[in-house]
Regions:
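Conserved phosphate-handling catalytic cores of large alpha/beta enzymes
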Residues: 116-119, 126-145, 151-215, 224
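Short nucleic-acid-contacting surface segments enriched for D/E, G, S/T with interspersed K/R
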Residues: 535-551
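Active-site proximal loops enriched in glycine and acidic residues that flank catalytic Cys/His/Asp
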Residues: 130-131, 359-362, 389-390, 400-402, ...
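A contiguous loop/helix-start segment that scaffolds small-molecule binding in enzyme catalytic cores
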Residues: 239-240, 244-248, 449-538
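Hydrophobic helix-and-loop "lid/oligomerization" segment in the mid-to-C-terminal part
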Residues: 2-125, 143-150, 200-448, 467-469
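OB-fold single-stranded nucleic acid-binding module
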Residues: 431, 439-443, 470, 546-581
Length: 581
């Protein structure tokens, strides 16, 4: 286990100093901590073409019950929340127009796989939240299928290539295309919500306020930076005022796992995966129910619950249950697929390269699981992993996952710098990729040479605080970090603490839990905890006197009004303490 302190050695004002190390100015810091008002929100007028979008929306508000507005629902949580915000907002202004949500059958985006479905609705307008900026050819073709032509409203946040053409039939509002809009970390739901704020400003209303919780859910689920002051305001305000009935139902279902707290981390770990599982593994009927739950959660639907035939349930409650089932189903399928891929790895000696690259051929499983498979295999084999399929054009497309605890801090940057990939889209250690099959061998040669001295089996941590167990300020450090638990998220990760010289005997090791696999060690008033720790128990049992080193995260345990400072252990190193004296 290797650790590197990535900021200055902070010995006071722990959270404040860390946030300034991460780029906040003193003025920004105070706002970030307190969120006293909405001054961090940018004026939506800074989004290019928003006035034209408002004019198009004005026409939508006048559509009759003989007209249709098609809304394409992108296939991720940001897509669902973006479309849900738009539809509910439009309903504030027009209760009669026929609004048709169109869901992707797979993990598609924009018009690429929804073209025929949209055409069949004979729409007057097509709205594409969280996608569509790159759909020039589809828009041009579809617009002219009708006379008069149909028009498109695109509310997006994705990066657009410099040579992209834009159709005269579309109004595109995109923060990436708006030089005056400074927050490039706003997601599709955020852009959609800002559009609603703009229209409110024209009409003297505040309907958009009702949907800030969905904008917050989209921001967290799409892994946008939580260091952005605007994102901080939206997420802080949205999670404090959850109004969407389905979002509430999901939080109630996951309340135990979330510890009753709605924060960027608890939502990312316990809410987003449920919705993603439904999008990936649910039937079309179940996915449609899930989206309906977002826009009309109190609607009664026939219960699909075993033993409840002939009864009705609110769709938000029904879909929350189905999302949980979809997660379990997805995990079962995933386990089976990973087993099959492990056979392929062994058969073709794929571990001979520094990058585990699995080119799929005949494997029959949904491409929506590529990323999850890559994540599981990367964790098991402790190396960056790509799971991808070869298409008819000779290009391999799929998903990559790097290791967060390794010397290779950005697998995405590594692939970009190699020059072999046609695209990498996503985050440092989780992104979609494309590479021509003819370049695969050359990439392996490049990677094997560049990474020859990198030991992916040895965990490597970028830590924010380093201490020895006897340091007097560890308790204060834990309290300070834990009381700011709603700050941490993507781009502003929960601080890692590295503690050395925890000198104990085997009698200091407490074994807890129903499965007797939870470790608790108390030293100098700090409880060091690790769950599912059978391997750690074996390692600790080797010695009578133990020198322990840990990397972990701060936690405050509350019981009957009493608080215990804890470190939740991420990783550890055990040495024979008898040799240390």
């Amino acid at each position: 286990m290797k650790c590197k302190l990535v900021n200055k050695d902070i010995r006071e004002n722990y959270t404040n100093e860390l946030l300034m190390e991460r780029g906040l100015s003193p003025e920004e810091l105070q706002y970030f901590l307190d969120v006293p008002d909405d001054s961090a929100l940018q004026d939506p007028i800074n989004l290019d073409y928003i006035e034209q979008a408002g004019a198009m929306f004005e026409y939508m508000t006048t559509c009759t019950n003989q007209e249709t507005i098609a809304v394409i629902v992108d296939s991720d949580v940001d897509g669902f929340t973006s479309a849900a915000i738009f539809i509910q907002y439009l309903r504030k202004w027009n209760t009669v127009v026929n609004i048709v949500p169109i869901l992707h059958k797979g993990k598609g985006h924009g018009l690429s796989d929804t073209y025929d479905d949209v055409i069949n609705t004979h729409p007057s307008f097509v709205v594409i939240p969280d996608a569509g900026s790159n759909d020039f050819e589809y828009i041009e073709k579809m617009a002219q299928e009708f006379e008069p032509p149909i028009y498109f409203l695109i509310l997006d946040h994705h990066i657009v290539e410099p040579d992209t053409h834009f159709s005269d039939y579309a109004v595109i509002v995109n923060n990436q295309l708006s030089p005056n809009y400074k927050n490039k970390d706003l997601c599709g739901a955020g852009v959609t919500w800002q559009f609603c704020r703009y229209y409110d400003s024209l009409k003297g209303t505040s309907y958009a306020d009702e949907f800030i919780d969905l904008a917050a859910l989209g921001i967290v689920s799409d892994m946008m930076s939580m260091l952005s002051l605007e994102n901080r305001y939206i997420v802080h305000t949205g999670f404090k005022n959850i109004q969407n009935y389905f979002f509430k139902a999901l939080c109630e279902k996951q309340a135990f796992s979330m510890g009753g707290k709605v924060t960027p981390i608890t939502v990312a770990f316990y809410i987003t995966p449920l919705i993603n599982a439904m999008i990936r593994a649910g039937s079309m009927e179940e996915k449609e129910r899930c989206f309906t739950a977002f826009i009309d959660g109190h609607q009664l639907v026939p219960s699909q619950k075993r033993g409840a035939k002939g009864t009705y349930e609110e769709v938000a409650i029904e879909s929350a249950r189905e999302c949980t089932n979809a997660r379990a189903k997805q995990n079962r399928v995933l386990d089976k697929v990973v087993e099959e891929l492990e056979i392929k790895i062994a058969k073709h000696d794929l571990l001979s390269n520094k990058i585990l690259f699995i080119r799929l051929d005949d494997e029959d499983f949904p491409p929506e699981l590529n990323g999850l498979c890559a994540m599981k295999l990367a964790a098991k084999y402790q190396r960056p992993t790509i799971v991808a399929r070869l298409n008819d054009e000779g290009e391999i497309k799929g998903s990559s996952r790097g290791l967060n605890e390794s010397e290779l801090t950005s697998f995405k940057n590594f692939m970009d710098e190699s020059g072999f990939f046609t695209f990498t889209a996503g985050h440092d250690n989780a992104c979609g990729i494309g590479i021509y099959d003819k370049n695969l061998s050359a990439f392996h040669e490049y990677a094997n040479e560049k990474l020859a001295n990198v030991d992916f089996g040895e965990n490597w941590y970028e830590v924010n605080f380093e201490r020895i167990a006897a340091d007097q300020d560890i308790e204060q450090l834990i309290y300070n970090i834990a009381e700011h638990e709603d700050l941490w998220g993507q781009g502003n990760p929960e601080p890692l603490i590295h503690i050395r010289d925890i000198n104990i005997t085997k009698h200091d090791v407490q074994v807890m839990g129903k499965s007797a696999d939870t470790v608790k060690i108390v030293k100098f008033g700090i409880a060091y905890m690790k769950f599912h720790a059978k391997q750690m128990l074996e390692d600790l049992a080797k010695y009578d006197v133990i020198k322990l080193e840990v990397v972990g995260r701060a936690n405050l345990n509350e019981w009957m009004g009493q608080y215990t400072p804890q470190i939740f252990i991420s990783n550890y190193q055990v040495e024979d303490g008898a040799l240390a004296f």
